[in-house]
């Protein structure tokens, strides 16, 4: 990563490291390949996503339940597409 990261970008990247393989499999590729070049609106949405609790994230990624915002659901689908094609 670049030394030119903003404080907010550093925080989001740090928070994206969950230590939970089921979530990291989606977050890691996105952070490494797409996050820094994403539009500001998508970065803000990803920041909101990584601020959620692990049990909620697991339910959303495994489609047990849906996130409260349609935008979060769309971002989750995008992250899943990056991994599964």
From Swiss-Prot:
One Pfam short name: Sdh5
Taxonomic superkingdom: Bacteria
GO cellular component, one term: cytoplasm
Subcellular location: Cytoplasm
Biological function: An FAD assembly protein, which accelerates covalent attachment of the cofactor into other proteins. Plays an essential role in the assembly of succinate dehydrogenase (SDH, respiratory complex II), an enzyme complex that is a component of both the tricarboxylic acid cycle and the electron transport chain, and which couples the oxidation of succinate to fumarate with the reduction of ubiquinone (coenzyme Q) to ubiquinol. Required for flavinylation (covalent attachment of FAD) of the flavoprotein subunit SdhA of SDH and other flavinylated proteins as well.
Family stated for the protein in its record: Belongs to the SdhE FAD assembly factor family.
Name recorded for this polypeptide: FAD assembly factor SdhE
One Gene Ontology biological process: succinate metabolic process
Listed InterPro entries: SDH, SDH_sf, SdhE_FAD_assembly_factor
Recorded coiled-coil stretches: none
Keywords: Chaperone, Cytoplasm
